[in-house]
UniProtKB/Swiss-Prot annotation:
Origin species: Dictyostelium discoideum (Social amoeba)
UniProt similarity note: Belongs to the UPF0538 family.
InterPro entries, per the entry: UPF0538
Pfam families: DUF2340
Name the UniProt record assigns to this protein: UPF0538 protein
Source species taxonomy: Eukaryota, Amoebozoa, Evosea, Eumycetozoa, Dictyostelia
Record PANTHER family: UPF0538 FAMILY MEMBER, UPF0538 PROTEIN C2ORF76
């Protein structure tokens, strides 16, 4: 049976308007992990990984697939606002949500996302 542990790229988004984004590379992630448990893991990594000091103050609560390997990248460089079906369901595993090896997942605050989606304007 194929090993289910994969590398995932998490795009931690502090600000949509200013494109304040930092990538967190996670290795050996079991794709059968529940999304709610995965969010806790990522939040813990943000608190303990060097270089994420400006990102520690936000309470990130949502995940959405930004890019699936061998797929088309979205036009918006901050987040994939075209495909709302890419939100990760907390009650399903990563694999059940369509996450595969080297998937890029955005991690952000939903309230900030909704404001940005109404007016996707960059301020820089």
């Amino acid at each position: 049976m194929e090993n289910e542990n994969k590398i995932l790229i998490i795009r931690v988004i502090r600000s949509f308007e200013y494109r304040t984004i930092k990538n967190l590379i996670l290795k050996d992630i079991d794709l059968n992990t529940n999304v709610s448990d995965f969010k806790k893991l990522v939040a813990d990594k943000i608190q303990t990984t060097p270089g994420f000091t400006p990102f520690k103050t936000k309470q990130y609560d949502s995940m959405k697939i930004f890019f699936v390997p061998h797929g088309q990248k979205p036009n918006n460089l901050t987040i994939n606002i075209e495909n709302d079906h890419f939100f990760l369901n907390n009650n399903k595993s990563l694999a059940e949500n369509g996450v595969v090896y080297e998937t890029e997942i955005s991690f952000f605050v939903m309230e900030d996302y909704l404001k940005y989606k109404e007016n996707p304007e960059n301020k820089w």
